[in-house]
Amino acid sequence: KWPNQWEVTDPVTGVGIGRSTMVAFTTNETVLSRAEAYVHLKEYDKAVADLNAWIGSFYLVGQNGIESLTRERIAEVYGDPSSDRYIAEYTALEPTSRKPLHPHGFTVEAGEQEHLIQTTLFCRRIETIADGLRWGDIKRYGIVIDRFDDSAYNDDNTTGFTVAATLGEKDLRRALQLPQEVITAGLEANPR
């Protein structure tokens, strides 16, 4: 994700230092943030256009079975249980990419708005993997996180996963703890 760049420090001996550059704001992540904003403004066509721009940065749409998104296709995936493409809501027994949303301080309407938010969150999850940005989505939408114990996993039938811990929608651990120096100086720590 972050390419390694070699900087030669001594050309005679060929010694150098490997460096990686992490870009704070990528175009792709910014486009997905704008798509999310368009969904909240109910400008769904603009949101889908941004989602398609993001997809186009990875894939040649129209080739090898890659299709562009439409509002109808998104509704089929998230709203039509009879469709082969339908994604059911996440449960611990049947994990999927479609998480129940419990937004804090705003609402997400059932139907098209929720479908587009789910699509955008899934794209953001792919785009921001290993960047540490998923936490903002988890907190903002109150997404419940299950941690699985796979010690009894059976590769033959993919069974044996059990939920070891859950971070609930109103779990106090969602608030980051204040630094110890601040607590020592007299500020009350965030409750746990």
Question: Where on the chain are the PLM-derived regions?
Answer:
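Acidic/polar-rich alpha-helix caps and helix-coil junctions
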Residues: K1-R192
